[in-house]
Every structure is written in structure tokens, then in C-alpha cells.
Design a protein with these regions (language model features):
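Catalytic phosphate/metal-binding cores of nucleic-acid and nucleotide-processing enzymes, i.e., regions
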Residues: 1-126
Length: 126
């Protein structure tokens, strides 16, 4: 049976929601208790992160079989700039129904994030 465009859209939206909730739980388990999904309706407004509560980071979550990383990075950057809060754009991604989460961001943003961490100050056990 072939799916209609409407069915494909609903399936994609549901997969995205499941992925975002999975990422919320993974980040909370990692020690970030304030992470939550943003309110989304009729798609989402440009500049809105998929998740909030991870200080300094604009989260774009992708739960797909095949990810166009360049497109996802561009979307994350565009949305983070639209937010106007200076958060670092990052794409959190995983393969649908398998594996763990990965993070992609430009090297310059990673350096900025890392430089502000305790790891850069030599306190790796904190």
C-alpha cells in the first residue's frame, strides 16, 4: 500500500517528536534537568530551537535514516541567528530507531564552547 503525502507528513512529524523526546531524556540523564521540547504548532517559527534548557546551545534535533548534514547545519545556523540570543548552533542527530545521538557544529563554535568549559581549564574531573 502506497502512503499519501499526508500520511508521510504525519509519519515524519511523529518520528521527529519521538526523536526530540528521546533526546530530551538522554540530555536529562546526562545531567541537564531543564531540557525540554519547545512548543510547536503548524510547523515552527523560524528561529525556534527544537529543545531549550541547554545553556548557550541552539539545538536542532534530527532523527532520520539519511541526514543531509550540510542542510541541517545551515538550518541550525539560520535559526540560531534568528533567535538573536548568541546561542551556538548545533545539530543533534541519530539514525531512526537505532544508535545513540551525535552532535555536529562548526569547529569555530566547538572551540568557543570548549574554551568556556572546565575541561579547557584543566579541571577534567568536574
Amino acid at each position: 500500500m502506497t502512503k499519501t503525502k499526508s500520511q508521510i507528513g504525519k509519519s515524519s512529524k511523529a518520528r521527529g517528536k519521538r526523536g526530540e523526546l528521546d533526546l530530551v531524556h538522554s540530555l536529562r540523564d546526562a545531567g541537564f534537568p531543564d531540557v525540554k521540547r519547545t512548543v510547536q504548532y503548524c510547523g515552527k517559527a523560524t528561529g525556534t530551537a527544537d529543545l531549550v534548557g541547554l545553556p548557550g546551545v541552539h539545538v536542532e534535533a534530527k532523527n532520520v535514516e539519511r541526514l543531509n548534514i550540510w542542510s541541517a547545519l545551515a538550518q541550525s545556523k539560520r535559526d540560531a541567528e534568528a533567535d538573536g540570543n548568541g546561542n551556538i548552533p548545533a545539530v543533534f542527530f541519530k539514525r531512526n530507531r537505532s544508535g545513540g545521538w551525535y552532535v555536529a557544529m562548526p569547529l569555530s563554535d566547538f572551540v568557543r564552547l570548549y574554551a568556556s568549559s572546565d575541561l579547557c581549564k584543566g579541571d577534567v574531573n568536574k
